[in-house]
């Protein structure tokens, strides 16, 4: 953890094939990417072999601009513990992108996320995102942005944390994007909802 940065972002997003479950990625800032990648590669290369698995521990995610190394970590419940919004899996895939360590429960989620970033298909600049962000503080400890229509279409595993009030009135709320932000000052938590 000596190379970990100060922030962690969890992303849940729709795959191109909308019949599949949502994709999930954790993005952790990294202070020294070169050292962190060296340590991760050493960890992956010295981990015990997985019985009966033929998939390589290190593969590539190819984009138009670059090939990114993708590491299959030894099986663990880490991703599930950190997010609690994915189907149970023991797999965790990792890659470095733009000074961040990306973690995902499957290689497809990770590759899709990297390709979207590489193409510049991000929320910054999108009108709905910018409108919501204009009403929030620049300083916060936690922020959530959710398109209720997409949230309500997810499996029960993904919507179990949505308050009953929103679920009972889903026909109304599916037309909204929710922005929630929490800031902590002097031990007091201040919510900001837009």
Predicted regions and their residues:
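Signature of soluble extracytoplasmic/periplasmic domains of secreted precursors
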Residues: 1-194
């Amino acid at each position: 953890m000596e190379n970990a940065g100060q922030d962690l972002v969890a992303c849940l997003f729709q795959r191109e094939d909308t019949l599949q479950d949502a994709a999930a990625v954790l993005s952790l800032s990294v202070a020294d990417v070169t050292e962190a990648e060296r340590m991760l590669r050493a960890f992956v290369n010295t981990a015990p072999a997985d019985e009966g698995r033929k998939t390589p521990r290190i593969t590539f995610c190819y984009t138009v601009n670059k090939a990114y190394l993708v590491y299959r970590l030894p099986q663990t419940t880490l991703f599930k513990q950190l997010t609690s919004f994915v189907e149970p899996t023991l797999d965790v895939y990792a890659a470095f992108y733009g000074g961040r360590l990306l973690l995902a429960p499957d290689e497809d989620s990770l590759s899709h996320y990297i390709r979207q970033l590489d193409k510049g298909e991000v929320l910054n600049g999108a009108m709905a995102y910018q409108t919501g962000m204009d009403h929030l503080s620049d300083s916060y400890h936690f922020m959530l942005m959710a398109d209720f229509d997409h949230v309500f279409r997810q499996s029960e595993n993904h919507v179990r944390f949505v308050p009953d009030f929103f679920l009972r009135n889903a026909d109304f709320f599916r037309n909204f994007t929710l922005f929630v932000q929490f800031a902590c000052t002097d031990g007091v938590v201040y919510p900001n909802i837009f």
